[in-house]
């Protein structure tokens, strides 16, 4: 499962991690490959296709074949590996997968920016990326749903009176100073594009509060 993969990496290969997260850590890695899973972190690192270097699969006739692998470049013939990715199990069953990992950045943070209109929120996403900032994730949050969900699970959504819709940003950096600088820049860009307020989750408890509501 994705949970067991993440647990193994955290204990044994701490410098690297697997960013893809479809929303459920109970997901099977083989299923993620064959479904071409995505998730909110696709903003920075792409969907599952971006991570898969190779797969060993079982074809409908029982043949077991290896497609791709650890090579950085392989342009021999048809790219059957990417034909299978996203085929939803109709062409083969995944037995093994060779995955691309990324350097683990020690500091992660969450930022909520509030807007009066959906148009301002959507425009801000593009402006942040134009500034060269690629967040780990960014998600549009309907205020009524966010507040209602928070009340249902006995949590508190940080924005209630400011604006009508929110953007939830997740960012990661190598240092704490860089994290706050990035979050501050995002907040400033959003404010220049119609944001009426912003809140940075200061610690892991506040971040977990936002993610649980999300």
Where are the predicted features?
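C-terminal substrate-recognition/cap domain of FAD-linked oxidoreductases
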Residues: 102-103, 112-117, 122-214
